Amino acid sequence: MLLWLLLLILTPGREQSGVAPKAVLLLNPPWSTAFKGEKVALICSSISHSLAQGDTYWYHDEKLLKIKHDKIQITEPGNYQCKTRGSSLSDAVHVEFSPDWLILQALHPVFEGDNVILRCQGKDNKNTHQKVYYKDGKQLPNSYNLEKITVNSVSRDNSKYHCTAYRKFYILDIEVTSKPLNIQVQELFLHPVLRASSSTPIEGSPMTLTCETQLSPQRPDVQLQFSLFRDSQTLGLGWSRSPRLQIPAMWTEDSGSYWCEVETVTHSIKKRSLRSQIRVQRVPVSNVNLEIRPTGGQLIEGENMVLICSVAQGSGTVTFSWHKEGRVRSLGRKTQRSLLAELHVLTVKESDAGRYYCAADNVHSPILSTWIRVTVRIPVSHPVLTFRAPRAHTVVGDLLELHCESLRGSPPILYRFYHEDVTLGNSSAPSGGGASFNLSLTAEHSGNYSCDADNGLGAQHSHGVSLRVTVPVSRPVLTLRAPGAQAVVGDLLELHCESLRGSFPILYWFYHEDDTLGNISAHSGGGASFNLSLTTEHSGNYSCEADNGLGAQHSKVVTLNVTGTSRNRTGLTAAGITGLVLSILVLAAAAALLHYARARRKPGGLSATGTSSHSPSECQEPSSSRPSRIDPQEPTHSKPLAPMELEPMYSNVNPGDSNPIYSQIWSIQHTKENSANCPMMHQEHEELTVLYSELKKTHPDDSAGEASSRGRAHEEDDEENYENVPRVLLASDH
């Protein structure tokens, strides 16, 4: 804090500069209240003379009176003022003429801090007694039954005074109250005004402060003292008889709010001035310059930056501030006794790029530097690869756009595109943003894609994105698979539909004429099949359709003709009939041979080389229930055939079915005797062969559907219904 060098001018202030002193208005008698009908004399005087020189102007309730004497008499109540040639208008004096019986009078003039005399007066004062005085409704102490009292150190407030008394009316005492009285207290001195030789002094120059006031000319003997302040700090030595304070040199620290106080030496009255703002001006700074490190203002995100602001000249404390284009508030501010200052910006970001300037201010006005551009290069962020296709699921032939974009990164940015680990190509984004690469899709384009971005500050790779290229189905081929070349009722028909190309899953639909038979979804290759147990109604045109969501493809039509007889029933019936016919033929042959043999044994029979007739009845017909044969080593005489036993050599015969129909073919080896009787029988040992054929019965109560179902259920078993058992031996073989 600088030392104050004070020069006190010991000249008391008597008047405010440039303002003429007020005229003085006096009353005679010196009471401001009188009874109605009485007269009061008004006297106008100036400071230099007891009476006014020249014309005197009188005003009653602000209206100019025609009287121009320095002394007048009045009988009307109101506010009176006067003015002379060498003075300004006096303060107003209110004179009251009361019609009341009791009045309260105050001595005039009365100034702030004076002791004032109050007098309670009745029209017939001799018959008035027991007077009491009140202030604001409260009785004043020691004021009972007094003709007059003194009120000490009055002030300019709104206090109301009145008095009460008893009036003698014949033999009665009547209490009477006066009207309230507001004492007209005049200012002892005016409110002070602080004046400075300059409100904006130059730093280092002197300044004079004056606390101006005006003492009432009617109280020239009153002594005043003065004190000056800056903000809340007392200047100089405190209270002084001089209203002036001279400061040899003003500095910026002396800027602030100034005010002063004036009081009587008795401390009875004190008044304060309004505040005045004084700012000390410095030698202005010049040639402000901004420098940036690293030199040139080229930075990479994450580096530190230093902004250096300097001035070529300027005095005192300088306030430096740094600013960026587009920001309202400054980046920083420093105040110091120096010609330069630095601002450190740590870990610069992309938002720190732009134009900068600095300002220097030493309480005069800020001086700005030139603009400097700062460039912050941003390494690319991890790019994001996105696919842009005409539809949600890409299809062969679609034009796919691969878009790679880094949300952060200084341009230019070079983007490279990859399928699996193979480079597809690259594209540059000169002004930032993303880049695209187009592909016309084939099935081979399915797989993982990625991209990377590089702006020279380090490449960044995207996450892999998987692409599945969907292949539309080709035209399907419908194949009919039946047990035989000709489809018959009861066959199990397989409809097989297959598209050789197309992405899975594929939904296959099967149609008979225009009716939908059903559908099957295939999640892998090989097509799909649909089975039908055929009836005559299944003849007609068949087709199928393949669809994987990219458009259905229809097969060519295949025609099927179903014949009316069931394949199983026809086979079994034919086998039964064939077996029966063969059995009859064998029996007939056996009978002929037997007859031939008997004919040869009879006298006169046929010779071995001749042909003789024989009766078929002479040959014994074998039993149809148990087949047998003759051992050729036995005697040849005729005897009954021994019963035949079958060897247990049955295979693939369905014993569980209760409805088989069997046919039996068997041959008999005869003895010599039998051979002679049955010449047509074979003479050599032969194996007896038995053919079994199962013929299914048709149930009368079966519907067409049930019959078809039965046929399908036993379709595989029917394939084993035609079997041969190799041998059946005669009992004699054992």
UniProtKB/Swiss-Prot annotation:
Biased amino acid composition, Polar residues: 608-627
UniProt-annotated location(s): Cell membrane; Cell projection, Microvillus membrane
Tissue expression: Primarily expressed in secondary lymphoid tissues by mature subsets of B-cells. Low expression on transitional B cells which increases to higher surface expression on mature and memory B-cells with innate-like features (at protein level). Expressed a low levels in naive and germinal center B-cells but also expressed in NK cells (at protein level). Expressed in unfertilized oocytes (at protein level). Expressed in a population of thymically derived naturally occurring regulatory T-cells that exhibits a memory phenotype, specialized in suppressing immune response to self-antigens.
Entry's Gene Ontology molecular function annotations: kinase binding; phosphatase binding; transmembrane signaling receptor activity
Changes after translation: Phosphorylated on cytoplasmic tyrosines; required for interaction with protein tyrosine phosphatases and protein tyrosine kinases.
Region Disordered: start-end pairs: 603-655, 695-734
Residue numbers covered by motif ITIM motif 1: 648-653
Consequence of changing H445N: In a breast cancer sample; somatic mutation
Keywords assigned: Cell membrane, Cell projection, Disulfide bond, Fertilization, Glycoprotein, Immunoglobulin domain, Membrane, Phosphoprotein, Receptor, Repeat, Signal, Transmembrane, Transmembrane helix
Pfam families: ig, Ig_2, Ig_3
Outcome of substituting Y650F: No effect on inhibition of cell death. No effect on interaction with INPP5D, PTPN6 and PTPN11. Loss of phosphorylation, calcium influx inhibition and interaction with INPP5D, PTPN6 and PTPN11. Alters binding with SYK and ZAP70
GO cellular component: cell surface; external side of plasma membrane; microvillus membrane
Effect of Y722F: No effect on inhibition of cell death. No effect on interaction with INPP5D, PTPN6 and PTPN11. Loss of phosphorylation, calcium influx inhibition and interaction with INPP5D, PTPN6 and PTPN11. Alters binding with PTPN6 and PTPN11
Subunit structure: Interacts (via phosphorylated ITIM motifs) with phosphatases INPP5D, PTPN6 and PTPN11. Interacts (via ITIM motifs) SYK and ZAP70. Interacts with IZUMO1R/JUNO. Interacts (via extracellular domain) with IZUMO1; the interaction replaces IZUMO1R/JUNO as IZUMO1 receptor after adhesion between sperm and egg.
Protein name as it appears in the record: Fc receptor-like protein 3
Taxonomic source organism: Homo sapiens
